Design a protein with these regions (language model features):
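C-terminal catalytic/motor cores of large multi-domain enzyme assemblies
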Residues: 2, 6-16, 20-39, 43-287
Length: 287
C-alpha cells in the first residue's frame, strides 16, 4: 500500500545496521597457529568457532508499537486471511498526460495542484459499477458477500509514522478539481498526522502509488476487508510499438490485487482492460 505520477510517496527506510570488529581471542589464536605449526592451527579454528561475537554487532532496536504495529497487524491479517492474486498490465497514457497539461492552468487559477491521481480515481469509479465484486467484501461470519453501491476510495499515503489511507467518499459524484483539492488536503494532513479516525475509515477500494519513487510493478496488499486494490507504477515515456515502428510513448504500469475468494482472475483482467480505456483517453469520463 506504494508512490512521479501523483501525490503519494512510498519511502523505504532501513532500521538495522551491522558492523563487525576483529575478535581478539580469534586473532591471538591465529597468530599462535602461524608460529607453532599445524596442531596449533586446529586449535585456532576451534577457538574462532567458539568466539562470542554478539557484543561486537551493532543493532538498533525500535519499539514495535503505535501506528507501525497497527499497520503490521492489518497487513498480516490481510495476507493471511484473503488469498491474493495479482494482475499486471500497462495503460497507454499519452491522452492522460495531454489532458492534465490542458487542465493544469485552469486548476492553478483555482489554486489547486492537479496531479494524475484524480484522473485515476475517476476512472476507477467509472469502471467499478461494471465489476461489483471489486467493490465488495466477504462477511465470513454471515456467509455473505457485501456489494457496495457507493464508491469510497482510499488513497495510500506514506508518512514518517507509516502508511496511512485517508478516504475520499463518493468519488463518482465529484469533479476533477474537487477531487484534487480534497486529495491534496488529505495527503498534507496525513503527513502532519492531523487526520481524524473517521477520515481513515469506510473505503470500498484503495489506490496505492508506489511509482512516484520509481518502479513499475508490485503486488499490493489488500486493504482488508476490501476485495480490490490498484497499484500505480511510474508514469513515464517507454518504447512502444505504433504502426510497426518503435517510438517513445507515455505509459502507466498497473498492478491489481484481488481477494480470490470473491473475485475471479477474469474479472480483474476485465477491470484493467476497461480502466486502460479511460486512462488512454480521459474524454470517455464525460460519457
Amino acid at each position: 500500500m506504494t508512490e512521479a505520477t501523483t501525490t503519494t510517496d512510498e519511502p523505504a527506510t532501513a532500521v538495522t545496521e551491522a558492523a563487525t570488529t576483529p575478535n581478539e581471542t580469534a586473532t591471538a589464536a591465529t597468530e599462535t597457529a602461524t608460529t607453532a605449526g599445524e596442531p596449533a592451527a586446529v586449535d585456532a579454528v576451534a577457538e574462532t568457532g567458539d568466539a562470542d561475537t554478539t557484543d561486537t554487532a551493532a543493532v538498533r532496536r525500535e519499539p514495535y508499537q503505535g501506528i507501525r504495529q497497527t499497520i503490521g497487524e492489518a497487513m498480516a491479517e490481510s495476507a493471511h486471511t484473503a488469498p491474493h492474486a495479482s494482475h499486471h498490465d500497462t495503460a497507454p497514457a499519452g491522452g492522460l498526460v495531454e489532458a492534465r497539461q490542458r487542465l493544469k492552468p485552469r486548476a492553478e487559477d483555482e489554486g489547486v495542484h492537479l496531479t494524475y491521481m484524480p484522473f485515476v480515481m475517476k476512472a476507477v469509479a467509472a469502471v467499478l459499477p461494471e465489476y461489483p465484486a471489486m467493490n465488495a467484501q466477504l462477511d465470513e461470519d454471515a456467509g455473505e458477500i457485501l456489494y457496495h453501491d457507493r464508491y469510497h476510495i482510499g488513497v495510500a499515503v506514506a508518512t514518517d509514522a507509516g502508511l496511512m489511507v485517508p478516504v475520499v467518499e463518493d468519488v463518482d459524484r465529484k469533479g476533477l478539481l474537487e477531487l484534487a483539492a480534497e486529495v491534496n488536503d488529505l495527503v498534507e494532513r496525513a503527513r502532519n498526522r492531523e487526520l481524524t479516525p473517521d477520515e481513515l475509515q469506510g473505503s470500498t477500494f484503495t489506490i496505492t502509488n508506489f511509482g512516484a519513487i520509481g518502479g513499475e510493478y508490485a503486488t499490493p496488499i489488500l486493504n482488508y476487508p476490501e476485495t480490490g486494490i490498484l497499484g500505480l507504477g511510474e508514469l513515464r515515456q517507454r518504447p512502444v510499438v505504433e504502426d510497426g515502428e518503435v517510438v517513445a510513448g507515455h505509459t502507466l504500469p498497473l498492478s491489481v490485487s484481488i481477494d480470490h475468494r470473491v473475485v475471479d482472475g477474469a474479472v480483474s483482467a476485465g477491470f484493467c482492460n476497461d480502466l486502460k480505456t479511460y486512462l488512454e483517453d480521459p474524454i470517455h469520463l464525460l460519457l
